[in-house]
């Protein structure tokens, strides 16, 4: 992305969130893998936070980015961009508010799978619970605007992202077998910014 021409569309916001969250999940895996430290944090909330930064912060966030990217091609309709960006932001904030306090709880010695805990853990547990509520809103919003877009969304067009891949040269949604005849590719699939010529000849 450095020195690139980046458009902060909803899929890009989810992609950037994926990079950040998955990086935190990966780096905290080093702590879990270090024997001396793992003796202290094993079976604590630190492990819970690490797991969720990898699996939810990584995989689910990437899935949401991909879903937003492909939605126009799948349905032929655009979703409203403003609520989608808001949902991406709410998801990112809610996720970190839910799971980052769990790193601290685990480091301070709170074991997982316990429903009762000493009073000193109360504030961080309340923060984590509040974050889960925010995260739930972030996950529910796409269901609403995706459903809305199926009927009221703007017509997407064949290539709403100005992408250069072959899949964006067919209609949205694509017909059976994508193309009626085999297309002839006339330019590189990653030739962004060179010209505005059509990359295939039908």
Model-derived regions: residue spans:
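Membrane-interface loop-to-helix entry segments
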Residues: 49-57
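Hydrophobic alpha-helical membrane-insertion segments
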Residues: 18-23, 87-100
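Extramembrane terminal tails and long inter-domain/linker segments of multi-pass membrane proteins
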Residues: 111-120, 149-202
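Hydrophobic alpha-helical transmembrane segments
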Residues: 59-67, 136-139
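Contiguous transmembrane helix-bundle modules in multi-pass membrane proteins
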Residues: 118, 122-135
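Divalent metal-coordination and catalytic microenvironments
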Residues: 52, 93, 103, 143
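Acidic/histidine-rich
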Residues: 23-29
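Juxtamembrane membrane-water interface segments of multi-pass membrane proteins
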Residues: 1-14, 31-47, 62-88, 101-123, ...
């Amino acid at each position: 992305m450095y020195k690139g021409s980046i458009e902060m569309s909803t899929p890009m916001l989810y992609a950037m969130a994926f990079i950040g969250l998955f990086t935190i999940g990966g780096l905290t895996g080093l702590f879990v893998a270090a024997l001396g430290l793992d003796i202290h944090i094993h079976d604590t909330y630190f492990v819970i936070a690490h797991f969720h930064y990898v699996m939810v912060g990584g995989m689910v966030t990437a899935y949401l980015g991909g879903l937003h990217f492909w939605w126009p091609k799948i349905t032929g309709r655009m979703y409203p961009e403003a609520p989608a960006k808001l949902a991406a932001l709410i998801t990112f904030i809610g996720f970190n508010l839910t799971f980052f306090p769990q790193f601290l709880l685990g480091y301070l010695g709170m074991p997982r799978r316990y429903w009762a805990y000493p009073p000193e853990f109360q504030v961080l547990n309340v923060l984590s619970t509040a974050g889960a509520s925010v995260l739930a809103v972030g996950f529910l919003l796409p269901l609403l605007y995706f459903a809305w877009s199926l009927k009221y969304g703007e017509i997407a067009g064949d290539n709403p992202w100005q992408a250069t891949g072959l899949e964006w040269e067919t209609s949205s949604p694509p017909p059976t077998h994508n193309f009626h005849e085999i297309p002839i590719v006339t330019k590189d699939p990653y030739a962004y910014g060179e010209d505005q010529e059509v990359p295939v000849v039908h």
